[in-house]
Amino acid sequence: MKEQLKPLLEDKTYLRHFWHPVCTLNEFERANASGHGPMGVTLLGEKLVLARLNSKIIAAADRCAHRSAQLSIGRVCSNAGKDYLECPYHGWRYDEAGACQLIPACPDKSISPRAKISSFDCEVKYDIVWVRLDNSFDCTQIPYLSDFDNPDMQVIVADSYIWETVAERRWENFTDFSHFAFVHPGTLYDPFFASHPTVYVNRVDGELQFKLAPPREMKGIPPEAPMGDFTYRCTMPYSVNLEIKLWKDDSRFVLWTTASPVDNKSCRNFMIIVREKDNQPDHMHLAFQKRVLDEDQPVIESQWPLEIQTSEVSVATDKISVQFRKWHKELSLSAVEGREAFRDSVLTNVIEEEQ
C-alpha cells in the first residue's frame, strides 16, 4: 500500500509575522556599484527589492505599480536632496514609504494614491538585513546573538548560502546531536560515542534553550574543531545561538546560524562566528565550517518530501526536534486565532529544568 504522506505544517503564513534575514550588509553593498542597491531578494516566496534611501535600507515589493517591471533592476537616484527608487521601464520614482513621487511621462498630472508599492519592516542588525512581512501582531523580535558588540570578541559575518531544503530541516540538522557520529566522524565527533543522553529543553521568551556536554574522551577530533560544553539559545523560528566553552582554554566561541525560507523548496542560510583568545585568521574558521557544511548538505538535501511529515518516526534522542516541531505547529494554529493567541504561543515559557 502506498504510504500516506501529510506535512506537519499545512499553513505556514504565520512565518510572515517573524523577522527573517535576507542578505548580509556586505552582500547588499556588493550588489550594486553604488553600494545603495537596488538588490532583489526572495522571502517566503515573495520577491522583494532592497534599496538604501536617505541613509536607511528599505524593503518593498519588487514590482512597479505601473507595468510590473522588477524595481531591483532599476536604480537609486537623488533629486533635491532626497533619494528615490526608480523603475527601469518608465522611470517612475518611489520614496522610502513606497509612494510614487514622479511619473516622467505625465509630470504635470496628479499622481493616483494607487501608484504605490507595498513596503515592509526592514532593519540592519548584526551586519545583516532583516525583513518582517507582516507587523500586524507586532510581538516578535530580531533573534538573539550573544557578544556581537563585545569589543573583546572577534567577529566573522560569513556570506550567506542556499540549500535546496526547507528551513525546518536545516534548523533540525544544526541542533541534531545523533547525526554527528555518522555524518561528521573525525570532523566533529568520535563514532565510538554514537549514543548520548536526552537533554532538558526549555521554552523561554521565544527561545528553545538546552545544553549538551560532548564526551571529553573522544579521539581523532582535529584541533581546529571548536569542541567544548554547548549551550544553545534558539530564537524561533529558525535561529541558533550556540555558545561553546572551549575545553582547550575555557574561552568562549559562539557559532550563530539562521535559516531563512526563500520559498517552499529552498532556504538561505546565515552564519556568524564570535570568538575570543584566538589568533587564527578568519579563513581558517570559515574553511572548517565549510568542511562541516559540505558533509551535511548532501544528506539534508536528500530528505524527501521536503516538508516535515507527520509520519516520521521519532525516538527519545529526537527530543529537541520534537519540541521544535510541536512549537511550530502551535504557532501555525495560533496565528489563525489572532494576535493575542499568537503572542501567547510565542512568549509563554515552558520550563523543564532551571538552567
Curated annotation (Swiss-Prot):
Cofactor: [2Fe-2S] cluster
A Gene Ontology molecular function term of the record: demethylase activity
Reaction(s) catalysed (UniProt annotation): theobromine + NADH + O2 + H(+) = 7-methylxanthine + formaldehyde + NAD(+) + H2O; theobromine + NADPH + O2 + H(+) = 7-methylxanthine + formaldehyde + NADP(+) + H2O; 3-methylxanthine + NADH + O2 + H(+) = xanthine + formaldehyde + NAD(+) + H2O; 3-methylxanthine + NADPH + O2 + H(+) = xanthine + formaldehyde + NADP(+) + H2O
Pfam family membership, one: Rieske
Positions contributing to [2Fe-2S] cluster binding: C64, H66, C87, H90
Residue intervals of the Rieske domain: 19-131
Gene3D superfamilies in the record: Naphthalene 1,2-dioxygenase Alpha Subunit, Chain A, domain 1 (3.90.380.10), Rieske [2Fe-2S] iron-sulphur domain (2.102.10.10)
Chain ranges passing through the membrane: none
Cofactor note (record): Binds 1 [2Fe-2S] cluster per subunit.
Upper lineage: Bacteria, Pseudomonadati, Pseudomonadota, Gammaproteobacteria, Pseudomonadales
Record PROSITE patterns: RIESKE
UniProt GO BP: alkaloid catabolic process
InterPro entries: Cholesterol_7-desaturase, Rieske_2Fe-2S, Rieske_2Fe-2S_sf, VanA_C_cat
Swiss-Prot/TrEMBL keywords: 2Fe-2S, Alkaloid metabolism, Iron, Iron-sulfur, Metal-binding, NAD, Oxidoreductase
pH dependence remark: Optimum pH is 7.5.
This protein's name: Methylxanthine N3-demethylase NdmB
